[in-house]
Swiss-Prot record:
Protein name: tRNA (guanine-N(1)-)-methyltransferase
Originating organism: Thermus thermophilus (strain ATCC 27634 / DSM 579 / HB8)
UniProt record similarity statement: Belongs to the RNA methyltransferase TrmD family.
Catalytic function, reaction form: guanosine(37) in tRNA + S-adenosyl-L-methionine = N(1)-methylguanosine(37) in tRNA + S-adenosyl-L-homocysteine + H(+)
GO cellular component: a single term: cytosol
Taxon lineage: Bacteria, Thermotogati, Deinococcota, Deinococci, Thermales
Family annotation (PANTHER family): TRNA (GUANINE-N(1)-)-METHYLTRANSFERASE
HAMAP family, alphabetized: TrmD
GO biological process: one example: tRNA N1-guanine methylation
Keyword Zinc set for record: no
Function: Specifically methylates guanosine-37 in various tRNAs.
Length: 239
């Protein structure tokens, strides 16, 4: 899978690719990432990339001619993703859709964002949350990492991402490791029992419990299994 990240601050992006599983995926050729400096497409001697907004207002806006020149250099691409707080929510489902593509272009803005005409050249406008950052680099890296980890071979155990939060519509169950007791807090006995069916039941139950506590809106639209539906009914009766 190939990525092109277009940004005014390439040195914010490159270090992220030099650690952990992304670094290994790049070394093994499972993914390719090109980081494009938007300023290289700037105008004039000073490589100007932005201008004041028509109609007045604070801040500067990235010019469409500069942004599209950088974008067209990266084409062809399966998807052109513009990162913006005004975009549609980036979810695990969207990550799975994008992970099936061969080439993604990620447009990371700055200042007051891109001239609105740049949106005509994007296939998707995505947001990673209802808040505003100083730029789109963090959002672009979130999309890159969430999709790259779904590429076969990037994560050693494919079961890992099949059990992730949101994959089945619920949050993940709580995870524990050694020691079995820490400052009076014990690992649930069922996890030490070696009884695989009971462990699976406990995990489903705790995933439901955690989702109800932290993200109750997810439960209403999650495709619950028969076991999960029974566990949910039991929890309702307990209350």
């Amino acid at each position: 899978m190939r990525y092109t990240v277009i940004t005014l601050f390439p040195n914010l992006v490159r270090p992220w690719l030099e650690e952990s599983l992304l670094k290994k995926a790049l070394e093994r050729g499972l993914i390719r990432v090109e980081v494009v400096d938007l300023r290289a497409f700037g105008l004039g001697r000073h490589r100007t990339v932005d201008d004041t907004p028509y109609g007045g207002g604070a801040g500067m806006v990235i010019r469409p001619d500069v942004a599209v020149a950088a974008l067209e250099r990266a084409l062809p691409a399966d998807e052109v993703v513009l990162l913006s707080p005004a975009g549609r929510p980036f979810t695990q489902k969207v990550a799975e859709e994008l992970a099936g593509k061969e080439h993604l272009v990620l447009l990371a803005g700055r200042y007051e964002g891109f001239d609105a005409r740049v949106e005509a050249f994007a296939t998707r406008i995505l947001s990673i949350g209802d808040y505003v950052l100083m730029g789109g680099e963090v959002a672009a890296l979130a999309v890159l990492e969430a999709t790259a980890r779904l590429v076969p071979g990037v994560i050693g155990d494919p079961q890992s991402h099949r059990e992730d939060s949101f994959v089945r519509g619920l949050l993940d169950y709580p995870q524990y490791t050694r020691p079995p007791e820490f400052r009076g807090l014990r690992v649930p006995e069922v996890l030490l029992s070696g009884h695989h069916q009971e462990v699976e039941r406990w995990r489903r139950q705790e995933a439901l419990r955690r989702t109800l506590a932290l993200r109750p809106e997810l439960v209403a639209r999650a495709p619950l299994s028969l076991l999960e539906a029974r566990l949910l009914a039991e929890m309702d009766r307990e209350e």
